[in-house]
């Protein structure tokens, strides 16, 4: 069953200042929780475009949102194609855009998807199952230097070199084909004292592989730039991140867009080109309440940032 506990539901959607007849985009449909709440705030004239590159997510969410079928349109593509897809539909400005960058719990919990170090399954990790690159391809074919780079950059794993070296050693004898096999390789590479602290020893490596397989950070960077461009004046963007790499991209993009470029001296009036594009609404990120964390432990690392188009 495709069930997913939505994180920061009201905070993210209410933060968009929803207008009943507005046009909105949910860039990360997932289980459909944010979309459902947003649609409940729209009139019959309102419209929601919901993106997800996972066909299964769209299938299940379309059932959940069946009563809103006149107001919602599903788009089965990565959100990095936000502008391209909306432009093809004749949409060039919107009133609000939402990103929830967490991996859907069902994707984590379906063993055959290969996202989780808790289950033994084929090394896959593709959000879009039509794409060719898998985690197995990276683990078995990418050179040592590339493995070190992604483990360190995307997983912030301090034992990146040791893990990459151990992978190289093992794959010379036989391919590493399952998540269980990879977990054993990681455990063998990380010193025992480090394995006993800081959560599961495979957590950071699995995060790094998932990000690399799906090109998550670059896709998000591109999509967020497009989202800012698409917003109508007064429109807002809500972004929920789950780790420091995504949060840094969001924070830096918002900061850059909310600053005026350096002004030439002696200008009597501030030209439009020199006005900030965004106003940051959340000076500090919004985090889940104690009550929400009690209901959903997976929300513990969530941060919400909101900005408004000037």
Curated annotation (Swiss-Prot):
It catalyses: cytidine(1402) in 16S rRNA + S-adenosyl-L-methionine = N(4)-methylcytidine(1402) in 16S rRNA + S-adenosyl-L-homocysteine + H(+). It is found in: Cytoplasm. Its EC number is 2.1.1.199. One of its GO terms (molecular function) is rRNA (cytosine-N4-)-methyltransferase activity. GO terms for biological process: rRNA base methylation. GO terms for cellular component: cytoplasm. S-adenosyl-L-methionine binds at residues 32-34, 52, 79, 100, 107. Keywords: Cytoplasm, Methyltransferase, rRNA processing, S-adenosyl-L-methionine, Transferase. Belongs to the methyltransferase superfamily. RsmH family. Specifically methylates the N4 position of cytidine in position 1402 (C1402) of 16S rRNA. This is Ribosomal RNA small subunit methyltransferase H. It comes from Geobacillus thermodenitrificans (strain NG80-2).
């Amino acid at each position: 069953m495709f069930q997913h506990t939505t994180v920061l539901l009201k905070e993210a959607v209410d933060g968009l200042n929803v207008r009943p007849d507005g046009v909105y985009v949910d860039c990360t449909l997932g289980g459909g929780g944010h979309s459902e709440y947003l649609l409940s705030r729209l009139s019959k004239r309102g419209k929601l475009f919901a993106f997800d590159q996972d066909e299964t997510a769209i299938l299940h969410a379309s059932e959940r949102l069946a009563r809103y079928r006149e107001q919602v349109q599903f788009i089965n593509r990565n959100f990095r194609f936000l502008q391209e897809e909306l432009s093809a539909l004749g949409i060039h400005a919107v009133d609000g855009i939402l990103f929830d960058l967490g991996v859907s719990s069902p994707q984590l919990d379906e063993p055959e998807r290969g996202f989780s170090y808790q289950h033994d399954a084929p090394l896959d990790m593709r959000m879009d199952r039509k794409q060719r690159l898998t985690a197995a391809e990276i683990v078995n074919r990418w050179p040592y230097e590339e493995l070190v780079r992604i483990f360190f950059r995307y997983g912030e794993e301090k034992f990146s070199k040791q893990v990459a070296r151990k992978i190289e050693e093992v794959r010379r004898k036989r391919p590493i084909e399952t998540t269980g096999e990879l977990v054993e390789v990681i455990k063998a590479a990380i010193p025992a004292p480090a394995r006993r602290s800081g959560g599961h020893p495979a957590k950071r490596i699995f995060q790094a592989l998932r990000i690399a397989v799906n090109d998550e950070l670059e896709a998000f960077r591109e999509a967020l730039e497009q989202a800012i461009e698409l917003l109508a004046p007064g429109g807002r963007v809500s972004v929920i991140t789950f780790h420091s790499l995504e949060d840094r991209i969001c924070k830096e993009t918002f900061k850059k867009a909310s600053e005026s470029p350096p002004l030439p001296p002696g200008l009597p009036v501030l030209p439009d080109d020199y006005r900030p594009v965004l106003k940051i609404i959340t000076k500090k990120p919004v985090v889940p309440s104690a009550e929400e964390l009690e209901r959903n432990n997976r929300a513990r690392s969530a941060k919400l940032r909101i900005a408004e188009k000037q």
